[in-house]
Regions:
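Ligand-binding clefts/hinges and TM-proximal coupling segments of bilobed small-molecule sensing domains
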Residues: 32, 39-41, 62-104, 110, ...
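Acidic, polar ligand-binding/catalytic clefts
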Residues: 30-39, 143, 147, 152-215
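A ligand-binding cleft/hinge motif common to bilobed small-molecule-binding domains
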Residues: 25-41, 162, 179-187, 234-236, ...
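A bilobed periplasmic-binding-protein/Venus flytrap-type ligand-binding module shared by bacterial periplasmic
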Residues: 43-62, 200-210
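Short loop->beta-strand "edge-of-pocket" segments that line small-molecule binding or catalytic clefts
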Residues: 112-118, 213-230, 241
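Bacterial N-terminal signal peptides that target proteins for export
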Residues: 1-11
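C-terminal motif of bacterial Sec signal peptides marking the signal peptidase cleavage site
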Residues: 19-23
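Extracytoplasmic small-molecule ligand-binding "clamshell" domains
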Residues: 56-59, 63, 67-75, 79-83, ...
Length: 282
């Protein structure tokens, strides 16, 4: 009788432990994050060059156009997005021919390197992998462009808030990292053609009371400092009614703040935001 009682006690203990472990596991389930149906406006990505470097910008565009025609750009897009998202048959935004005295392409050919400036925390366009190597969609595009141009790609991480200064002082040859084309940037840089469509989205925790842009009133909203997300938000009347605006160095950090519950909403490029959410879901 004692032996039977002891066995029953052990069985009950095992069952209780299993229930406890199951409960602990479910309590650690990660929160889900959703994108609001209403966005803060559509835009396009482009490659930014110094205003006078038209010849260089046109050569890079020539190689990109060739990659679109021969399918290489679609192959790279499929790798990162699972579909071809490259814009096709788009017009030049500025000059489609360079002045005779423009030696910007010759300088790149002579030195043999093409320095790409980027925010290295901007997945999937350009970011560091588990080996601390900068990878991404834009990096793959630029690598192929440089291969066709016969020069070496040099990836140079920069402070995104000072990107225009980095370009103007010659520390980098272009800004190629999910760079949204805005009127202000068009006035300060040379862009050939846009290559990807984008929009500014709002990410919130699933079940949040924030359902529309207007619901941001009184809320704590985070975004990347110096980004087009800030421009898009400032262009909306709700920007004057926020509880607090939090500007941080990069989007990965802003997303971490959202997951930690320290901000209520995250304004970000759709390409980046959906990638971050999809990585969390895996």
């Amino acid at each position: 009788m004692k032996k039977t009682t002891k066995m029953l006690g052990l069985l009950m203990a095992v069952l209780m432990m299993g229930a406890l472990l199951t409960g602990c596991g479910s309590s650690k389930k990660a929160n889900a994050y959703v994108v609001l149906e209403e966005d803060l406006g559509a835009e396009q990505y482009g490659i930014g060059f110094r205003k006078g470097d038209v010849a260089l910008g046109l050569e890079v565009q020539k190689q990109l156009d060739a990659m679109i025609q021969d399918g290489k750009a679609a192959e790279i897009s499929q790798k990162w997005f699972g579909e071809d998202i490259m814009l096709k048959d788009v017009d030049y935004l500025k000059e489609s021919s360079a002045p005779a005295n423009d030696d910007s392409l010759k300088k790149i050919k002579d030195k043999g390197t093409f320095i790409l400036g980027l925010d290295d925390s901007f997945p999937p366009m350009g970011f560091r992998d588990e080996n601390d190597t900068v990878v991404g969609f834009d990096i793959d595009l630029a690598t192929e462009v440089c291969k066709r141009m016969g020069v070496e790609l040099v990836v140079q991480p920069i402070d995104w808030d000072s990107k225009e200064l980095e370009l103007e002082t010659g520390r980098i040859d272009c800004i190629w990292n999910g760079l949204s084309i805005t009127d202000e940037r068009l006035a300060a840089m040379y862009f050939a053609k846009p290559y990807i469509a984008n929009k500014q989205i709002i990410i919130v925790p699933e079940g949040s009371e924030i359902k529309t842009v207007a619901d941001l009133k009184g809320k704590k909203v985070g975004l990347q400092k110096g980004s087009s997300a800030l421009d898009a938000l400032n262009a909306n009347p709700v920007s004057k009614e926020l509880g607090e605006l939090v500007e941080l160095q990069d989007n990965v950090t802003v997303y971490s703040e959202l997951k930690a519950g320290r901000i209520d909403a995250f304004v970000v490029d759709e390409v980046v935001g959906r990638y971050l959410i999809s990585k969390d879901a895996k």
